[in-house]
Amino acid sequence: MGMSHARAYHASSAFSIAGLVSRGEESRGRLSSEFGDMYPTFGDYEDALRRTQPDAVCISTWPDTHAAYATLALERGCHVFLEKPLAATLADAERVIALARKHGRKLMLGYILQHHPSWMRFVTEARNLGRPLVMRMNLNQQSSGSEWKTHLQIMQSMPPMVDCGVHYIDVMCRMTRSRPVRVHAIQARLDDGFGLPDGQCNYGQLQVVFADGSVGWYEAGWGPMMSRTAFFVKDVIGPRGSVSIAAERHESSDEVNAHTRTGALRIHHASLGPDGHFARMDEVIPTDDEPDHDELCAREQAFFAKAIREDLDPGEHLEAALYSLQVVLAAEESARTGRVITLDNAR
């Protein structure tokens, strides 16, 4: 994600890059050479903040550093674009949001699907299906090589159900416009000498119930053992019909563009005619002209710039981020304890 965001800033007329930070010498070199070594590079984040005095910071690091790095930037008066998840705990997430409000700085989260035109249409069509909704989603990734190394690093702090789940719970919240109230989850540790972190699971599935009666499930699994069968399910059913994303059949489950690309939207209408048969044919909406991953990151950064320039209120955006984080963390607790978790939404 960091490279894609750096490309977006490099190409943007709204931002000028003051410095690039990466703790590893090799990754720092790749980052610098991408832009012809034209920007200062740093191996230490705090040193970079002190020496460059930036107006804004983009944080695309491992999840367990997010809250601490965002705190350092906000305390220096910087606006912050922060990749998901907001923090590893709900308490830390709430503290970061409170700090942004205290200093009057913009805090934007990297919910990339909020800026994807096909996913925006997916949400809109789901809202037309009536209530309650049944939402079925997953993203399983059969990973190896560098992709598996990245997954192992992320799992040092959280399982895939949490890391990826915040995206899709956010989508469900936007589809229902309702509060999540109850969560249950299962998980499994699939390891045969692959080096999973101690105590960590690389497969999980959660079920969430919303206040309006809508229900959803989300499944995520990572690793060399994962099946590619039905790895990309994005399907919503309501009393009036259903809408589904038809994924491209040739996509690889660990290819980053496959995580957002839709292929087409299929809309099914439940209405019946006088003869008892369907009154309307299914609609297939092609989405051939979708933005790629770098373009989506550019759209995120354009919105970040707009939020700063026009002083947009990020309150609803941050509240949704808290809800999605609350659900996936509750799911992890449920899977660990075997209990159904009732959510406290008294904020």
Report the location of each language-model feature.
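Predominantly a Rossmann-like dinucleotide-binding segment in NAD(P)-dependent oxidoreductases
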Residues: L113-D198, G204, G338
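Rossmann-fold dehydrogenase core element
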Residues: R95-I112, G130-M137
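Contiguous beta-strand/loop segments that form the cofactor/metal-binding neighborhood of enzyme cores
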Residues: D170-N257, A298-E310, R347
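Hydrophobic residues in well-ordered beta-strands that form the structural core
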Residues: I59, L82, L107-L109, I245
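C-terminal helix-rich "cap/oligomerization" subdomain common to oxidoreductases
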Residues: A56-I59, E255-A258, E290-P291, F303-R347
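Beta-loop-alpha module in the N-terminal Rossmann-like domain of NAD(P)-dependent dehydrogenases
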Residues: H5, D37-L99, L296
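Active-site loop of classical SDR/Rossmann-like NAD(P)-dependent oxidoreductases
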Residues: R23, D289-A302
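N-terminal Rossmann-like dinucleotide-binding module
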Residues: M1-G36
